[in-house]
Amino acid sequence: MSNKVGLIHSLKDGQSYMEIWPVRKELGAIFPEQRIIKATRFGIKVMPAVAAISVLTQMAFNNYNALPQSIVVALFAISLPLQGIWWLGARSNTKLPPSLASWYRELHQKIVETGFALEPVKARPRYKELAIILNRAFRQLDKSSLERWF
């Protein structure tokens, strides 16, 4: 069975990963996800307007010779948030390196020890599972429990 994921599936995974990932200042220095998520959310809000303005200004000034270039600029502007969502989707399905996998297992064990129910530890966790565990840890563990890692 192939490990490759289609574009549409990656975009859906990217959107869900964007919602799952805990946007916390403690994680900003360790993981690039926070910066990618902020840039992607900004792009989702702003880039459609940039695309429309780039085409409409050429039409408003009757500069139809420059319309093909403005359409290319518009397509590029619209593609920027899609690139961020695609990157997040690909990242969410990437297996964790050994150091992060052990960190995932330690966090999982700490949450289970405090009495919270979790799904069983994954043998080969992905960034998606790490995001779920980090989200759970920040919501349910107190600051003294998290001091070791952050």
From Swiss-Prot:
It comes from the Bacteria. InterPro entries: UPF0208 (IPR007334). Signal peptide: none annotated. It is a multi-pass membrane protein. Keywords: Cell inner membrane, Cell membrane, Membrane, Transmembrane, Transmembrane helix. The keyword Flavoprotein does not apply. Pfam families: DUF412. It is found in: Cell inner membrane. The chain crosses the membrane at residues 42-62, 70-90. GO terms for cellular component: plasma membrane. The keyword Iron does not apply. NCBIfam families: PRK01816.1 (NF002493). Belongs to the UPF0208 family. This is UPF0208 membrane protein VP2081. It comes from Vibrio parahaemolyticus serotype O3:K6 (strain RIMD 2210633).
